[in-house]
């Protein structure tokens, strides 16, 4: 995989349609947007850019022989996860992956309330103008019509997910403002900003299937309701966009397997894939947060394409 950086932009002309996905850590890209990434990356008229904000240094390590990489030991997990991310990108067909500000510029902040929140380089403590300028630089270079990240809570309250949301919102506005970071390139107006969404019906389906499962790291174990999960659930009526691509199911699973320190092959994610399988991992949902909604399809009226309603130009 060729990894571009803001300091060394590609000079080759980009396809007409361009989408940028902003994620907090390696592995986040595949969980909520793996189908979207793979399907758009496979389209010859679409360029996909993945921006990863940190190296995920504070992540857990599920491989016993790699436990020495943990932040509280050798603190080498971030470097290892660069390789995992490269493997995931290869599985998804992504050729343009960037780290915000370059690899290691901002560090994984850990879960809220942990000592990692106080690390001077963590994304949670980043100067927002500085971090936003780095994302704006990439937006102005790539000129995406579509920008994708998380909701205001980051899906489940992780500080880096919240920051990724804030930075993406800033980039949507600031990339079009000639007074903001003029050194970061010519202005560009993104047409649509989306937030990833976990549809309530999808969570309920998983809950009903797995609540009594003995699968390792089953998040439903001991719960009586999906509302106890601690994640943001979006009512089905509020979902604006649904992407379904069962033929990219295997690519998504292969990308998940690449993140071996984070996802146990005996754990919940793969048990879910083997259980309700394509119903769980072949459909992804989004909420259009900014921009004009395109034409819908089917009885639910949802968009079936993040580019719905757009006339894309070079």
Swiss-Prot record:
Free-text remark on how the cofactor is bound: Binds 1 zinc ion per subunit.
Gene3D superfamilies from the UniProt entry: LmbE-like
Purpose of the protein: Catalyzes the deacetylation of 1D-myo-inositol 2-acetamido-2-deoxy-alpha-D-glucopyranoside (GlcNAc-Ins) in the mycothiol biosynthesis pathway.
InterPro entries: GlcNAc_PI_deacetylase-related, LmbE-like_dom_sf, Mycothiol_biosynthesis_MshB
Similarity-based family: Belongs to the MshB deacetylase family.
UniProt cross-references to Pfam families, sorted A to Z: PIG-L
UniProt xrefs under PANTHER family: 1D-MYO-INOSITOL 2-ACETAMIDO-2-DEOXY-ALPHA-D-GLUCOPYRANOSIDE DEACETYLASE (PTHR12993:SF26), N-ACETYLGLUCOSAMINYL-PHOSPHATIDYLINOSITOL DE-N-ACETYLASE-RELATED (PTHR12993)
Organism: Frankia casuarinae (strain DSM 45818 / CECT 9043 / HFP020203 / CcI3)
Entry keyword annotation includes Hydrolase: yes
GO biological process, alphabetically ordered: mycothiol biosynthetic process
Gene: mshB2
Listed transmembrane segments: none
This enzyme's EC code(s): 3.5.1.103
Gene Ontology molecular function terms on file: N-acetylglucosaminylinositol deacetylase activity; zinc ion binding
Record's protein name: 1D-myo-inositol 2-acetamido-2-deoxy-alpha-D-glucopyranoside deacetylase 2
The entry's keywords: Hydrolase, Metal-binding, Zinc
Domain of life: Bacteria
Cofactor list: Zn(2+)
Positions annotated to bind Zn(2+): 25, 28, 161
Ubl conjugation keyword on record: no
Catalytic activity: 1D-myo-inositol 2-acetamido-2-deoxy-alpha-D-glucopyranoside + H2O = 1D-myo-inositol 2-amino-2-deoxy-alpha-D-glucopyranoside + acetate
């Amino acid at each position: 995989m060729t990894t571009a950086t803001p300091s060394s932009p590609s000079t080759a002309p980009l396809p007409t349609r361009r989408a940028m996905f902003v994620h907090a850590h390696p592995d986040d890209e595949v969980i909520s947007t793996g189908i979207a990434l793979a399907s758009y990356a496979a389209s010859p008229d679409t360029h996909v850019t993945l921006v990863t904000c940190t190296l995920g240094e504070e992540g857990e390590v599920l491989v016993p022989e790699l436990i020495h990489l943990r932040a509280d030991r050798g603190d080498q997990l971030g470097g290892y996860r660069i390789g995992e991310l490269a493997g995931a990108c290869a599985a998804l067909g992504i050729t343009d992956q960037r780290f915000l500000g370059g690899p290691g510029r901002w560090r994984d902040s850990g879960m809220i309330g942990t000592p990692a929140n106080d690390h001077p380089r963590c994304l949670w403590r980043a100067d927002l103008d500085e971090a936003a300028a780095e994302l704006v630089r990439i937006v102005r270079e790539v000129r995406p019509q579509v920008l994708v990240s998380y909701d205001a809570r980051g899906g489940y309250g992780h500080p880096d997910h919240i920051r990724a949301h804030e930075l993406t919102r800033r980039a949507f506005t600031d990339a079009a403002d000639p007074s903001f970071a003029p050194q970061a390139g010519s202005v560009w107006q993104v047409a649509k900003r989306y937030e990833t969404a976990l549809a309530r019906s999808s969570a309920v389906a998983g809950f009903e299937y797995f609540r009594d499962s003995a699968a390792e790291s089953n998040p439903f174990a001991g719960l009586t309701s999906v509302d106890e999960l601690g994640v943001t659930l979006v009512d089905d009526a509020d979902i604006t966009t649904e992407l379904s691509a069962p033929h990219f199911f295997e690519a998504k699973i292969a990308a998940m397997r690449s993140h071996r320190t984070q996802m146990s092959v005996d754990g919940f994610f793969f048990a879910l894939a083997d259980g309700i399988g394509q119903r769980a991992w072949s459909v992804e949902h989004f909420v259009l947060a900014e921009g004009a909604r395109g034409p819908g399809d089917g009885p639910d009226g949802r968009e079936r394409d993040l580019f719905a309603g757009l006339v894309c130009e070079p």
